[in-house]
């Protein structure tokens, strides 16, 4: 018996049902890689960030997340080069979906119990997404803005429902505004740390502040 279509599991009807010691035998999620491109690029190399934002409360299958990841990656590699971007899938499929298998062969009515004991077996995993939640983010150089929008537009077709593309006012994957970021780095209030930054507050030990500004 093949996989049931994802439209059967589109809506969030039940409570979250994750893999646990009570819910065993769950198949592995199709999506295994959540970061692609130049993951180790320093925070100051990729200032532009684009998000795909969900406009519905629904469930997205791990197969759909994998298809969208491949689609966005293929377009970005072709248009910006394999080292010109960093894609991050922001959803993880933890919710387990079930199927109550029905026999369709001749004489099935004598073998199966119908809706008696209908709690199904695990079939796959989905990610539950809320309105306004980010599904996928891409950071890159400022001149690649149109390519980011097009890559996310193509990836949107892999998902049900409605999504919006949003170009962030923040710097890369950080939470600091792009127009203030460089000034904060110059004042040593932010210290680059891989693809993120460390925020140095105004309060704290004076020795640390002196060591930074010496």
Curated annotation (Swiss-Prot):
There is a cross-link at residue 188 (Glycyl lysine isopeptide (Lys-Gly) (interchain with G-Cter in ubiquitin)). It comes from the Eukaryota. Citrullinated by PADI4. Keywords: Citrullination, Cytoplasm, Developmental protein, Isopeptide bond, Ribonucleoprotein, Ribosomal protein, Ubl conjugation. One of its GO terms (molecular function) is structural constituent of ribosome. PROSITE patterns: RIBOSOMAL_L10E. It is found in: Cytoplasm. GO terms for biological process: embryonic brain development; regulation of translation; translation. Its main location: cytoplasm. One of its GO terms (cellular component) is cytosolic large ribosomal subunit. The modification Citrulline is found at residue 32. There is a cross-link at residue 175 (Glycyl lysine isopeptide (Lys-Gly) (interchain with G-Cter in SUMO2)). It holds the Pfam family Ribosomal_L16. InterPro entries: Ribosomal_uL16, Ribosomal_uL16_CS_euk_arc, Ribosomal_uL16_dom, Ribosomal_uL16_euk_arch, Ribosomal_uL16_sf. Belongs to the universal ribosomal protein uL16 family. NCBIfam families: PRK04199.1-4, uL16_euk_arch. Component of the large ribosomal subunit. Mature ribosomes consist of a small (40S) and a large (60S) subunit. The 40S subunit contains about 33 different proteins and 1 molecule of RNA (18S). The 60S subunit contains about 49 different proteins and 3 molecules of RNA (28S, 5.8S and 5S). Component of the large ribosomal subunit. Plays a role in the formation of actively translating ribosomes. May play a role in the embryonic brain development. This is Large ribosomal subunit protein uL16. The lineage of its organism: Eukaryota, Metazoa, Chordata, Craniata, Vertebrata. The gene is RPL10.
């Amino acid at each position: 018996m093949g996989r049931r279509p994802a439209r059967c599991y589109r809506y969030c009807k039940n409570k979250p049902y994750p893999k646990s010691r009570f819910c065993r035998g769950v198949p592995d999620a199709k999506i295994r890689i959540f970061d692609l491109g130049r993951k180790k690029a320093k925070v100051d190399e990729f200032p532009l960030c684009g998000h795909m934002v969900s406009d519905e409360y629904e469930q997205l299958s791990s197969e759909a997340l994998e298809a969208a990841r491949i689609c966005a990656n293929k377009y970005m590699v072709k248009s910006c080069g394999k080292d010109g971007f960093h894609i991050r899938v922001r959803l993880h499929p933890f919710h387990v979906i079930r199927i109550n298998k029905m026999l369709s062969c001749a004489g099935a009515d004598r073998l199966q119990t119908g809706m008696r004991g209908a709690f199904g077996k695990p079939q796959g995993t989905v990610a539950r997404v809320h309105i306004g939640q980010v599904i996928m983010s891409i950071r890159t150089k400022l001149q690649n803005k149109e390519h980011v929008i097009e890559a996310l537009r193509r990836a949107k077709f892999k998902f049900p429902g409605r999504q919006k593309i949003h170009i962030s006012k923040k710097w890369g994957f950080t939470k600091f505004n792009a127009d203030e970021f460089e000034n904060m780095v110059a004042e040593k209030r932010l210290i680059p740390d891989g693809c993120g930054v460390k925020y140095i507050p105004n309060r704290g030990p004076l020795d640390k502040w002196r060591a930074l500004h010496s």
